[in-house]
Amino acid sequence: MPLTVLCIATYRKGDEFLRECRRAGCRVLLLTEEKLRDSDWPRDSIDAFYYVRRDMPEGDIRKGAAYLARSERLDRIVALDDFDVETAAMLREYLHVPGMGETTGRAFRDKLAMRTRARSAGIPCPDFVHVLNHAAIEEWTSRVARPWVLKPRSQAAAIGIRKIHSASELWEIIATLGDAQADYVLEQFLPGDVYHVDSLIFNRRIVFAVASIATMSVRSQRG
């Protein structure tokens, strides 16, 4: 029986994946933003569209997906963009669909989880601290050379990153964050080129990998 694949894309992308699902004989459902309703999607490869608002509460998305699952057998849930990884992981766990859940998904989106996982595996990374316990932050800033970089844990690329040159500047910024402080990680700034490797792994074997260099130098204010 053909698989039914629910694809999530809150940005306009993923055409080739959608077409490949169709070529593979899958039933393809697309969950996207209301504002993308009239976008030039590969409509001949999509069986049905469903729409959400960017500010829709997570609970409402869960309820909507559960309602959809009353009539659709959801075999797979696929995120087509970085910003959709967490939503897809949440829905997989809630609907008990195969694939990585929220804990595993955080290792791909949460900068704190990424660094913790890398350090525990012995992979070199800049010194860092979770913006959570103030005593731990004070201890960290007393021993780690400046400048530092304050990063949102779940944004993509350089969005929301701030370069900090003093403890007083840091605490002023932390105060403005209020209850959102724990959504950030603080790390030592190390100037240099930034590379990343995109890969596909199947049955624990790397079947595709490509290395890229960031177009924006980390020597910049936001890098």
Give the label of every model feature segment.
Residues 169-173:
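Short amphipathic alpha-helices within nucleic acid-binding modules
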Residues 1-104, 109, 135:
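ATP-binding N-terminal substructure of ATP-dependent carboxylate-amine bond-forming enzymes
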Residues 49, 128, 184-186:
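Generic structural signal for residues in well-ordered beta-strands
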Residues 67-74, 142-144, 178-180:
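Glycine-rich phosphate-binding loop signature in dinucleotide/nucleotide-binding domains
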Residues 177-183, 189-223:
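Phosphate-binding core of ATP-grasp and ATP-grasp-like enzymes
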Residues 28-29, 125-126, 184:
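Hydrophobic anchor at the start of a short beta-strand
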Residues 93-160, 167:
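A conserved helix-loop-beta module that forms one wall/lid of the active-site cleft
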